[in-house]
Amino acid sequence: MTAPDVSEAFKMLSAFLSQDEHYLASSQAYGDRGIQGLNDALYLFLEHPDLGFVWMAYDDDGVAGICVICYAVSTSMGALVAKLDDVSVKADRRGEGIGTVLIKALKEQLTKESVTRIDVAVHLQNPEARAFYERLGFQPLNEERLACVIKTKEN
């Protein structure tokens, strides 16, 4: 994502985050700050590309899919890893393989950047998402993700 892409990224991600029932069920635990939080996040990626990036898939009609990558260091691998977050394909384009192409291209790009693993969290009540990622080579882990908000811009 570059500066001119911010408005398209904002539209795509705000639609996803405001409608995804699985995200909404956990949004309070995430410390969701709504549209201001999303806007701040997009500009953080522009200002600090070392933290991660927003990956967008385009077709003739514009943005068809989007995802967010955040970098981390794995102490078990002793290497750079990536957290895949907020993956979405436009509602009227789902089922066309855009998500698969998006993730495969993302894996190629991250490999070039020496990223050794991609982690993704899937909501327990979303077996379709789990099956999607497993088809793309992701393996289930015997753990559950927890969140603890320690500070927001409001407090």
What do these predicted regions represent?
Residues 3, 10-43:
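Conserved GNAT-fold acetyl-CoA-binding loop/helix
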Residues 134-143:
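Conserved acetyl-CoA-binding loop of GNAT-fold acetyltransferases
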Residues 69-76:
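A conserved beta-strand-loop-helix scaffold within acyl/acetyltransferase catalytic domains
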Residues 94, 120-129, 147, 151-152:
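Conserved beta-strand-loop-alpha-helix junction that forms the acyl-donor binding cleft
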Residues 42-56, 83:
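A short helix-loop-beta-strand connector motif used in the catalytic cores of GNAT acetyltransferases and
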Residues 89, 95-108, 131-135:
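Conserved acetyl-CoA-binding loop-helix of GNAT-fold acetyltransferases
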Residues 52-67, 90:
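Conserved beta-hairpin
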Residues 103, 110-121:
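Conserved GNAT acetyl-CoA-binding A-motif
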